[in-house]
Amino acid sequence: MFRFVCVLFIALVVFCTTTSAGELVCNRPNEEYRCGSACQTTCATLGQRCPIMNIRCNDACYCKEGYARYGDDTGMCVSISQCNSKRSAIAQILRSKQLSKNSGV
């Protein structure tokens, strides 16, 4: 029985070490594969610290330096200057909707 358990354990170790996940392919514009934070840099979270503390970094596709994801963690990487202009455009639309609502139009 002991011999069977040892053989099973060794087989499990060999299986686990040979079936590790392959490297992700990051082929979208301004994106690269690296080991990084648990939080993606997004336009909505620029300048904020990631609230998740990792023991080890995460292997994933991240935006290159100077870029952030537009939308959620899977959005396209856009330049940080585009984040600010898109935020301004959205804020302006919301303000105009609020003004038209207040004026009864």
From Swiss-Prot:
Expressed by the venom gland. It is found in: Secreted. The keyword Signal applies. Disulfide bonds join C26-C61, C35-C57, C39-C50, C43-C83, C63-C77. Residues 1-21 form the signal peptide. Residues 26-83 form the TIL domain. The keyword Repeat does not apply. Keywords: Disulfide bond, Hemostasis impairing toxin, Metalloenzyme inhibitor, Metalloprotease inhibitor, Protease inhibitor, Secreted, Serine protease inhibitor, Signal, Toxin. Inhibits metalloprotease (human MMP3), trypsin, chymotrypsin, plasmin and microbial serine protease (proteinase K). Exhibits antifibrinolytic activity by binding plasmin and inhibiting it. Does not inhibit elastase, thrombin or microbial serine protease (subtilisin A). Belongs to the serine protease inhibitor-like (TIL domain-containing) family. This is Venom metalloprotease inhibitor. It comes from Bombus ignitus (Bumblebee).
